[in-house]
Amino acid sequence: MATNSSGDSKNTLYCSFCGKSQHEVRKLIAGPTVFICDECVELCMDIIREETKASGMKATDGVPTPKDICEVLDDYVIGQATAKRVLSVAVHNHYKRLNHAQKAGNDIELSKSNILLIGPTGCGKTLLAQTLARILDVPFTMADATTLTEAGYVGEDVENIILKLLQASEYNVERAQRGIVYIDEVDKITRKSENPSITRDVSGEGVQQALLKLMEGTVASVPPQGGRKHPQQEFLQVDTTNILFICGGAFAGLDKIIKQRGKGSAMGFGADVREESDAGVGETFRDLEPEDLLKFGLIPEFVGRLPVLATLEDLDEDALITILTKPKNALVKQYQRLFELEDTELDFTDEALSAIAKKAIERKTGARGLRSILEDILLDTMFELPGMESVTKVVVNEEAVCSEAQPLMIHADEKESATAG
């Protein structure tokens, strides 16, 4: 501790690190024979944060096993057992490959295996990718393929994907280079026709070509604050070699291509001929071959950069009911918590849950449509409830889902009389 011996300042305390007096800082914390100010504490915290960020992903051990990854996925994503196994193994191998590359003396180079997720709308593709990033504690970003164009054209440059990943990693290049990128709607960037055209296809095949470089590994020059590149700007160099790319899409119409290919072998006596309606879209995707993706409009090089194929199935009524009620962040639990904040209990009858699931199947929106259905059912109730003090319970029954009827509201006096009776 330093003190000033002159006049009234004899008892003034000073920070032992920066030398500022107690009057120059907001807080001075005392220790045995030393003092530290709030500014020095903040500086120390910044240094520790930077150290933690830099070393966060340098550990060569600790990659979760495929079984561990799959178990965590089970907590958040219902069904899709095959897709979960494929993803768990692929992601485990990817990060094991990175740790293998860090060790000296490895003469065998392990190639990267990017992933293609194919499945109907609302079956869990995006949620799977988000959950994987959460399990592994790596930076994660999502991009919509429909907004991308080739460099130099109006639209979003593909390198903006890397900028978003960099932002997700708080501009820590080391962490960003081990992140996960999920590109949604890749089925919308297919070639407009199978024949070469004189006009340039800047939002279809052109985007596939631009994504190829990122997916196979290149050093992308990213403007630190985003926006368009200009010559006077300094760029951050990000190597995409170790970034895991997961592409996803509904691929509407791909099932017809697969069935058409299957028809060729279902000829002659004794052939197993199935009606088209026998199999759902998700079930048909199980028979997917790379040649089907080429016919759909993906270029061979793009398909080649996505060696791991995981197909997801349609969600049936039971699966949708489970999604509504079982996961940690299930929609029913979320709405029940919202109602708890109003000191009101929210309950759904089994018939209501079944009717909600059927409605989502009819709309062909899968799990994605469940929230909007619940919002429609509970909108008026949530509007009125904050101004009603006596309501203790709200019950959503089948009538509230299938007709214009409102959920049942149980008031405190009704509950008391029912208990007394």
From Swiss-Prot:
What are the UniProt keywords, alphabetically? ATP-binding, Chaperone, Metal-binding, Nucleotide-binding, Zinc
Which ranges carry the ClpX-type ZB domain?
3-56
Q: Does the keyword Lipoprotein apply?
A: no
Positions binding Zn(2+) in this chain are C15, C18, C37, C40
GO biological process, any: proteolysis involved in protein catabolic process
SUPFAM superfamilies referenced in this protein's UniProt entry, alphabetically: Glucocorticoid receptor-like (DNA-binding domain), P-loop containing nucleoside triphosphate hydrolases
Q: Which NCBIfam families match?
A: clpX (TIGR00382), PRK05342.1 (NF003745)
Question: Subunit details for this protein?
Answer: Component of the ClpX-ClpP complex. Forms a hexameric ring that, in the presence of ATP, binds to fourteen ClpP subunits assembled into a disk-like structure with a central cavity, resembling the structure of eukaryotic proteasomes.
| Family membership noted in the UniProt record | Belongs to the ClpX chaperone family.
Q: What is this protein called?
A: ATP-dependent Clp protease ATP-binding subunit ClpX
